[in-house]
């Protein structure tokens, strides 16, 4: 990843492993959404040892972090796990709806009412995450991710993003412009950017890269949105 960052002239790389990729976290939290593949870490020390391998890598600042799921009923347990170490950056993500419903589940009902209700529940859950103090996170990631499983977004999607970004601004959080979703749902990411422009909510660019060739993906598209809507980037 660091080598790929240097090749693409990235000066700062934040590595944020999913909290669900740690075996000890899965022992205390029942995650409704997990990656079926990818490395599992036995401990935070196991993970942090990977950063020792890239110390002194000229030209790239590497930040150690986590992408942490917000699951209301497990907020305390997740918070205790995350607080075991000091992190350079913490991201907060909602990957599941209450009841452990995976956002990317394509088998859920897709009629207009069901889809709209699901989107509203998703936005409310993200607001809850922002207002929560379960971890001291800086960035709410991919607020449009539900589109993977529920592609029919509500007609007032941008209004919902205005409400969400307003809450984020009030609580000192930034909202992510996600590189993966700029490929999958560019029109929704654009509406997220527009909403942040209206509320003066800060944004962050994240490539959401799981492989080296995805580092800085769609950064050019994110940059255009940042310029168009006069967004402040953290």
Predicted regions located by residue number:
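Short, glycine/charged-enriched secondary-structure capping and boundary segments
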Residues: 28-30, 77-80, 104-107, 154-156, ...
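Domain-core and long-helix interface of multi-subunit machines
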Residues: 92-199
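An N-terminally biased module of ancient metal coordination in phosphate/nucleic-acid-related enzymes
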Residues: 1-72, 82, 147-151, 155-159, ...
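Structured helix-beta-strand junction loops
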Residues: 57-58, 86, 171, 199, ...
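Structural preference for beta-strand elements that scaffold enzyme active sites
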Residues: 12, 61-65, 88-91, 137-139, ...
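Long, positively charged, glycine-interspersed low-complexity recognition regions
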Residues: 185-234
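Short amphipathic alpha-helices and their capping/turn segments at secondary-structure boundaries
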Residues: 1-11, 73-88, 122-136, 164-166, ...
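Hydrophobic alpha-helical segments and helix pairs
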Residues: 58-109
